[in-house]
Amino acid sequence: MFAGVIGPFSLAARLLDVTEIMIYCYEEPDMVHVLLEKATQFITEYCKAYKEAGANGVVIAEPVAGLLSPALSAEFSGPYVKQIVDAVQDDSFLVIYHNCGNSTIQMIDSILETGSAAYHFGNAIDMAEMMTHIPAGTVAMGNVDPAGEFRNGTPESIRAATLGVMDACCKYPNFVISSGCDIPPLSRWENIDAFFAAVNEFYAGTAAGRG
């Protein structure tokens, strides 16, 4: 069982306002760092409580960091996520880093430096391109469009989207197919069922010589 928490920069952005924190990163960086230290301490304790309660790990959602430049992400997000990972991750409790921004490929170095056990990316990026940057021993997950397919798509369209991602990415043994983010409310069960059916279809076809 995995728990979920918001990431440090994303939490700070909720507290300050997204637009304001973007400005403060340039105009008052020291203040942003103070807030990030406090946010990181809070999230760390939150993760420890999940760990003590018996969770097997936690997903740290850091989507607002996807709005930063690679340089700013390396300063204001990655190191703070790493502090959390270093404090809570071990063989019995894993951290999955989530970022659904469209610049994650450009900032992948600082993302990988967090040391998370696995990484999850949204549909704003080319997942096949992302996989070329992921070390072979590290799991990466993604990235069927949650809103466009699970919420607003059809069984036929989500089948095509799922098979498309898998065709492009399953040559990497460390790739795991998933939605690109949370499944939106009111998503139709037939679309969710179609996603899993497509996954089964892909692997059945692979076993029979598909691809």
Which positions does each model-derived feature cover?
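Active-site loop segments of alpha/beta catalytic cores
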Residues: M1-G211
